[in-house]
Curated annotation (Swiss-Prot):
Keywords tagged on the record: Endoplasmic reticulum, Lipid metabolism, Membrane, Sphingolipid metabolism, Transmembrane, Transmembrane helix
Functional description taken from the UniProt entry: Component of the serine palmitoyltransferase multisubunit enzyme (SPT) that catalyzes the initial and rate-limiting step in sphingolipid biosynthesis by condensing L-serine and activated acyl-CoA (most commonly palmitoyl-CoA) to form long-chain bases. The SPT complex is composed of SPTLC1, SPTLC2 or SPTLC3 and SPTSSA or SPTSSB. Within this complex, the heterodimer consisting of SPTLC1 and SPTLC2/SPTLC3 forms the catalytic core. Within the SPT complex, SPTSSA stimulates the catalytic activity and plays a role in substrate specificity, which depends upon the overall complex composition.
PANTHER family, A to Z: SERINE PALMITOYLTRANSFERASE SMALL SUBUNIT A
The family this protein is said to belong to: Belongs to the SPTSS family. SPTSSA subfamily.
Organism of origin: Bos taurus (Bovine)
Key word Endoplasmic reticulum present: yes
Keyword Endoplasmic reticulum: yes
Residue ranges that the UniProt entry lists as topological domain Lumenal: 27-31
Entry superkingdom: Eukaryota
Protein name, per record: Serine palmitoyltransferase small subunit A
Taxonomic lineage from the root: Eukaryota, Metazoa, Chordata, Craniata, Vertebrata
GO cellular component annotations of the record: endoplasmic reticulum; endoplasmic reticulum membrane; serine palmitoyltransferase complex
Transmembrane segments: 10-26, 32-54
Site feature (Within the serine palmitoyltransferase (SPT) complex, defines the length of the acyl chain-binding pocket, determining the acyl-CoA substrate preference) residues: 25
Length: 68
């Protein structure tokens, strides 16, 4: 019962995603290309934030002399 409800909820979120991004008008292969590009861009942004954010935070803390 809970699995069916979760599946219905995820289907609703996916439907909303298709409507908001206007992907419902595209063919399946175009939708796949768009989603692949979106996932890769978000993945690269998260990776870049993970790699470089600690360096920037430490530079800010040193600049404001919070950390010596």
């Amino acid at each position: 019962m809970a699995l069916a409800r979760a599946w219905k909820q995820m289907s609703w979120f996916y439907y909303q995603y298709l409507l908001v991004t206007a992907l419902y008008m595209l063919e399946p292969w175009e939708r796949t290309v768009f989603n692949s590009m979106l996932v890769s861009i978000v993945g690269m942004a998260l990776y870049t934030g993970y790699v470089f954010m600690p360096q920037h935070i430490m530079a800010i803390l040193h600049y404001f002399e919070i950390v010596q």
